[in-house]
């Protein structure tokens, strides 16, 4: 019943109007899985390769027909006839056929779309929801939790056309008792933030991830605006709602000078100075998580940052680790950061994603499941977060269907699982137990 009989790849459009790969995997019993690959803007240099056509006459060179041809041709040929329930085998076959270190022959966008579509088809064949199938693949059947959302309500950096250098200012509705309540709190703060920004004569257009993208005089001003919005919504900052930031520091690191340049503020810092700049913000505001607080290659700086702040708050590696077990293993050995951001298109298959989550958890690191800035209506990351009991999710703000699709799927899953999927709030965040 779970033998693969047909594989289809197609070019669809993502939330930024760029093409991406969608795949369908059809099984013997008439079961079908469909999934689409997301795409990042601030990408780590060691991510698996997203294959683009480079043909300037189509989609400004961003077409994905080569990746789609790989799905419809060589990938389909090798996995047709195989058992979709054996996810590790399906992924391994594709990885071996690609034969490159970073999936550059077929593209991680091709391999991932098929990998996820295969998992969805297998779940359908087993007559179970995707999160339940993922929990079985993860070796943790029936073990679920609802993730604490990190909601990106002010966008800067590569995600917005403004003067704010830090890429994401996020809220975590830690006072909520359920995921559904967390979404409500997030929505109320989001709408109150619009009022706060409007009252200051600021723009309330949204960035790629659905957060506002105003011009602000400093990063601290973004935090101050959020604090005002939280209070305006009737919540207590630090008790009901905590803060998180994604610096995406590689984007403002000057490799020539070795300095971190906050152009919006007209300031530049050495590596250790930037750590202390961030530490200063954490003393002023209840920031419990900082992602990519330094450049991905600044491992000495990260070791120092972890020493200074790692005992008190969650330090998440995104560009730093790129969901790659080899790099994560080295980071764990060297005591770099204490959490990993999980983006399955950074590594390019479900099996490798599950391996990264397991490695992190075994080492006492937390794992934060994440969207990309280029998304589709595909909500697989919601099932991934619940099925691995990862505990935290980053999937944007309270606007744009490409973001909200994930929250809505989490609401459905929570309704289905009830007490079997507890919402643990702040307890999920490293250093906040």
From Swiss-Prot:
Database matches in Pfam families: Enolase_C, Enolase_N
Catalytic activity: (2R)-2-phosphoglycerate = phosphoenolpyruvate + H2O
SUPFAM superfamilies on file: Enolase C-terminal domain-like, Enolase N-terminal domain-like
Pathways per UniProt: Carbohydrate degradation; glycolysis; pyruvate from D-glyceraldehyde 3-phosphate: step 4/5
Signal sequence interval, chain numbering: none
Residue stretches in coiled coil: none
Major localization class: cytoplasm
Bound cofactor: record note: Binds a second Mg(2+) ion via substrate during catalysis.
Example of a GO biological process term: glycolytic process
Gene Ontology CC terms: cell surface; extracellular region; phosphopyruvate hydratase complex
Binding site for (2R)-2-phosphoglycerate: 167, 343, 372-373, 394
EC number of the protein: 4.2.1.11
InterPro entries: Enolase (IPR000941), Enolase-like_C_sf (IPR036849), Enolase-like_N (IPR029017), Enolase_C (IPR020810), Enolase_CS (IPR020809), Enolase_N (IPR020811)
Gene3D superfamilies: Enolase-like C-terminal domain, Enolase-like, N-terminal domain
Residues noted as binding Mg(2+) in the record, renumbered to the chain: 246, 291, 318
Keywords in alphabetical order: Cytoplasm, Glycolysis, Lyase, Magnesium, Metal-binding, Secreted
Location(s), subcellular: Cytoplasm; Secreted; Cell surface
Function statement: Catalyzes the reversible conversion of 2-phosphoglycerate (2-PG) into phosphoenolpyruvate (PEP). It is essential for the degradation of carbohydrates via glycolysis.
Protein name: Enolase
């Amino acid at each position: 019943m779970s033998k693969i009989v047909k594989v289809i790849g197609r070019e669809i459009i993502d939330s930024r109007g760029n093409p991406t790969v969608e795949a369908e995997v059809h099984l013997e019993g008439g079961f079908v899985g469909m999934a689409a690959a997301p795409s990042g803007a601030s990408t780590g240099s060691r991510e698996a390769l997203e294959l683009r056509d480079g043909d300037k006459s189509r989609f400004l060179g961003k077409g994905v027909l080569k990746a789609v041809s790989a799905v419809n041709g060589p990938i389909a040929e090798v996995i047709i006839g195989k058992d979709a329930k054996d996810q590790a085998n399906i992924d391994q076959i594709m990885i071996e056929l690609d034969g490159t270190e970073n999936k550059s022959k077929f593209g991680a966008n091709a391999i991932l779309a098929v990998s996820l579509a295969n998992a969805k088809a297998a779940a359908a064949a087993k007559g179970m929801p995707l999160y339940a199938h993922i929990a079985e693949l993860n070796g943790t059947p029936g073990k679920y939790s609802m993730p604490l959302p990190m909601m990106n309500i002010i966008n800067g950096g590569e995600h917005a056309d403004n003067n704010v250098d830090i890429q994401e200012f996020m809220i975590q509705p830690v006072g909520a008792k359920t995921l559904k309540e967390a979404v409500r709190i997030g929505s109320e703060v989001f709408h109150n933030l619009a009022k706060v920004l409007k009252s200051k004569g600021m723009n309330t257009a949204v960035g790629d991830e659905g957060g506002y993208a105003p011009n602000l005089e400093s990063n601290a001003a973004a935090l101050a605006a959020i604090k005002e919005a939280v209070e305006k919504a009737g919540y207590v900052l630090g008790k009901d709602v905590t803060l998180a930031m994604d610096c995406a520091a590689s984007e403002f690191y000057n490799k020539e000078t070795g300095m971190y340049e906050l152009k919006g503020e007209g300031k530049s810092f050495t590596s250790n100075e930037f750590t202390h700049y961030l530490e200063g913000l954490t003393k002023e505001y209840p920031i419990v998580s900082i992602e990519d607080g330094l450049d991905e290659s600044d491992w000495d700086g990260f070791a120092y940052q972890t020493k200074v702040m790692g005992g008190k708050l969650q330090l998440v590696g995104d560009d730093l680790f790129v969901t790659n077990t080899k790099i994560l293993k080295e980071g764990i050995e060297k005591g770099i950061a204490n959490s990993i951001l999980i983006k399955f298109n950074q590594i390019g298959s479900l099996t490798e994603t599950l391996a990264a989550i397991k490695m992190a958890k075994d080492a006492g690191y937390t794992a934060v499941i994440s969207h990309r800035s280029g998304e589709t209506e595909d909500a697989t990351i919601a099932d991934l977060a619940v099925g691995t009991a990862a505990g935290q999710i980053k999937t944007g703000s309270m606007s744009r269907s490409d973001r909200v699709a994930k929250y809505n799927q989490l609401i459905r899953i929570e309704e289905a699982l009830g007490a079997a999927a507890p919402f643990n709030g702040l307890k999920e965040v490293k250093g906040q137990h």
